[in-house]
């Protein structure tokens, strides 16, 4: 089967954080606290932060073990209940989620080769989609829009929306169904051995591991290709689309 579509991871594949994660997370918490204070909820920042972090870390641990996603809105609502504060309505919880993620959205920036790679794949006639493990569907769309690349993707599937995480096959199957291609016609590009590479393999997709920096992983990596940039990934995809099973040499890894 010839390739018809490319599905990609988002964080650390197309975009990267411009600030340390701890700084970004603290800014998120401050933004959430400020929003709640404006609503008239009186809460000490340090106490609320301690409660929130405990719930956030528990949700993250559950996600890691069971591959389920607890969306940020649920985490915020639980933190308010634990703080013995009035639980906000659905609309206000959604707004609180948006305010929490605003600093983080601004911190995610494109890799230098992202736009040209996406443009090359689009010009090659390939459909594209995103599968992202994230606690906020809104944040994923906002990161794509802020960086000017949302228009490249006909399909955007998040773990927050699905409430399950990569590498579970259901999230890949949903994206394949939405984009309208078979696994054999689709390649997945991502940076995580466990979430991206093993997840794609479970549903019969070819995969490309984008190894931007050395990693230590207990999960065996068996991608069809390993590259160090999106440029190399694009050239590998073009080779597959043209029917070649060979990996391009480094000299061939330049976009036209």
Task: Explain the meaning of each model-derived region.
Residues 2-112, 116, 123-124, 137:
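N-terminal helical cap/lid subdomain that shapes the substrate entry/recognition surface
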């Amino acid at each position: 089967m010839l390739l018809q579509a490319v599905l990609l991871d988002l964080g650390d594949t197309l975009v990267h954080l411009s600030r340390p994660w701890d700084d970004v997370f603290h800014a998120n918490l401050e933004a959430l606290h400020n929003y709640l204070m404006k609503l008239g909820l009186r809460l000490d920042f340090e106490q609320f932060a301690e409660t929130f972090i405990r719930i956030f870390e528990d949700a993250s641990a559950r996600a890691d073990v069971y591959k389920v996603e607890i969306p940020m809105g649920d985490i915020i609502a639980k933190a308010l209940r634990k703080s013995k504060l009035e639980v906000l309505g659905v609309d206000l919880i959604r707004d609180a989620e948006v305010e929490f993620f605003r600093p983080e959205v601004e911190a995610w920036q494109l890799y230098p080769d992202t736009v040209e790679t996406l443009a090359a794949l689009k010009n090659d006639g390939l459909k594209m989609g995103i599968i992202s493990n994230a606690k906020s569907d809104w944040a994923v769309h906002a990161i794509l829009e802020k960086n000017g690349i949302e228009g490249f993707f006909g399909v955007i599937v998040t773990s927050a929306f699905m409430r399950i995480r990569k590498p579970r096959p259901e999230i890949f199957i949903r994206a394949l169904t939405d984009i309208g291609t078979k696994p054999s016609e689709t390649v997945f590009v991502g940076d995580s051995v466990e979430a991206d590479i093993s997840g794609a393999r479970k549903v019969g997709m070819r995969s490309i591991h984008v190894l931007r920096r050395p990693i230590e992983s207990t999960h065996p990596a068996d991608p069809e290709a390993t590259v160090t940039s999106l440029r190399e990934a694009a050239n590998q995809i073009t080779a597959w689309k043209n029917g070649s099973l060979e990996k391009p040499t480094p000299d061939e890894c330049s976009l036209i």
